[in-house]
């Protein structure tokens, strides 16, 4: 009997096929998205999904874990080597779960978090009031100046007033390098833990293309997808054995039950890919590509928050335009270019409308595109935004994008 999705559930299979077509024919430029390695997808689709393994390697609450123990141990050892950390927990189901576990490990209810404001480039889990991180704990926020950069002296003064228990550094939309050394000095000045959330830049960090948060951060969290190109999931890293014990208890039995062993296998496979020499070439290209894109947009008289980028993303500001981030997102989407609307420093519109868009280079770099291709894309983005209500132009560019994308197909089938 044929147990394939195609035979057993054609309705779902057909939608997966259409998504494959979209990924191949559109330009995926959402900064948090990437194209996962086929080898990782194979691991995620394996029979490991059948195995319950509550606990940690060689200390499980279930029998029959001799093989998954070894797989998790491989994932841990590879992550330690990648990030230069002494201790790693690879069980968090996501970056948000990783952050929640860290808070559970080091904070008591109503302790204080000082994190980057969501509207300035932070993340929901850094204390936003709509998140449990802003409901279980007292949350306070720092932001960026109008130039799009953190003022560390100002942050130091704010920390003296707030006296946080943990200072969170990390972002979902910040275009410059973080000064982890300075952040640690600020945390130490008020007796706070420094937690680094490097979910967005982890793939650059492990390649030496972005500052390493160690040895400055007490604890580091990350996702395993985004710039790492691994499976959707999270990880927690530290060099402190006492903190590691607290983190492990917070993950299990604190906020999670059984780990997802098929995903942990995917993490192990992904980390092996990240350890290859080719990974450094990819990460360097990610940065070169976003800079090539930025140069074109600046030449076309578009304003970029902070004037450019040190990482994998740029933020376009439309404060001086008569259209919004939502308008730009829609127009570019109609032309086959996928970005996302984003709040920016000095924001004057609601978070549902915004005055900016966020654009990233990781996914298209994974498809083999280089500076020349990003320059072409930059011109097309500017053409669309110059005449944002011209739907005929959007249709024309969509056809060009489809033709352009044929040379950069990354997957030949939808299921691995």
From Swiss-Prot:
Organism: Helicobacter hepaticus (strain ATCC 51449 / 3B1)
Cell compartment(s), UniProt: Cytoplasm
Catalytic reaction list: (6R)-5,10-methylene-5,6,7,8-tetrahydrofolate + glycine + H2O = (6S)-5,6,7,8-tetrahydrofolate + L-serine
GO CC, alphabetical: cytosol
Keywords: Amino-acid biosynthesis, Cytoplasm, One-carbon metabolism, Pyridoxal phosphate, Transferase
PROSITE patterns in the record: SHMT
Site description Plays an important role in substrate specificity, residues in chain: 225
Amino-acid positions noted as binding (6S)-5,6,7,8-tetrahydrofolate in the UniProt annotation, renumbered to this chain: 118, 122-124, 242, 350-352
CDD domains registered for this protein in UniProt: SHMT
Protein name, entry field: Serine hydroxymethyltransferase
EC nos: 2.1.2.1
Molecular function terms from GO: glycine hydroxymethyltransferase activity; pyridoxal phosphate binding
